[in-house]
Amino acid sequence: MFKKKNVSLAVVRRLPRYLRYVEDLLNHDIMRISSSELSQRMGYTASQVRQDFNNFGGFGQQGYGYSTQVLYENLVKILGLDKNFKMIIVGVGNLGQALANYANFYKKGFRLVGLFDVDPQKVGKSIRNIKIQHIDELKDFIKKNDVDIGVLCVPSEVAQEVANLMVEGGIKGIWNFTAKEIEVKDDVVVENVHLIDSLMVLSYKLNEKLLEKQEASQK
């Protein structure tokens, strides 16, 4: 598959949204869509849609638009969802348990293969038929099972320590839900998820709406 080097992160972050929408089109038996229709429904410009897809070869045909099936298959490959990445969760508190029970991981091709914690009240119990193991077993488990992704749901004060254990075990990517900005070697990919950041963005948008109403009422 053709792919430009150094695709911007902004483009990459739009790809899951494209995939969700195209999947919905297929579920409604819509087999073709133009860039203008796609852009209108998603809130982007047609030029933006074409530029995004051109980073990976384009996928469209002039005068025809996009085959939703072809678009879906290409987006799945671009996002690596055909790789069936193996995933573990470290820290089985409220967030870790919620993620462990999230069925969409399986639907999108991610395989949860391990759960880890230090709490003796949790170790030995199971979630979705996956036994919670003590963190002392983490490194060996990663090595033996060739785990790809480690999900970090531990307290921030131990985040770097646990990340180090993951890396020593041979983890390839870390999905970091802690407030700590962890440091890892260059060949390990990190995606930080700060839930409060998204809430603050919502707060900003809500505040803007309130200010607009206040200004309108004063005119």
Curated annotation (Swiss-Prot):
Principal subcellular localisation of the protein: cytoplasm
Source domain of life: Bacteria
Keyword ATP-binding attributed: no
SMART domains reported in the protein's UniProt record: CoA_binding
GO biological process: negative regulation of DNA-templated transcription; response to redox state
Chain positions recorded as NAD(+) binding sites: 91-96
Name of the protein this chain belongs to: Redox-sensing transcriptional repressor Rex
HAMAP family per the UniProt record, alphabetical: Rex
Molecular function terms, GO-annotated: DNA binding; DNA-binding transcription factor activity
Family: Belongs to the transcriptional regulatory Rex family.
UniProt keyword terms in alphabetical order: Cytoplasm, DNA-binding, NAD, Repressor, Transcription, Transcription regulation
UniProt organism field: Caldicellulosiruptor saccharolyticus (strain ATCC 43494 / DSM 8903 / Tp8T 6331)
Location of the protein in the cell: Cytoplasm
GO cellular component: cytoplasm
Annotated DNA-binding residue span(s): 17-56
Known role: Modulates transcription in response to changes in cellular NADH/NAD(+) redox state.
Subunit structure: Homodimer.
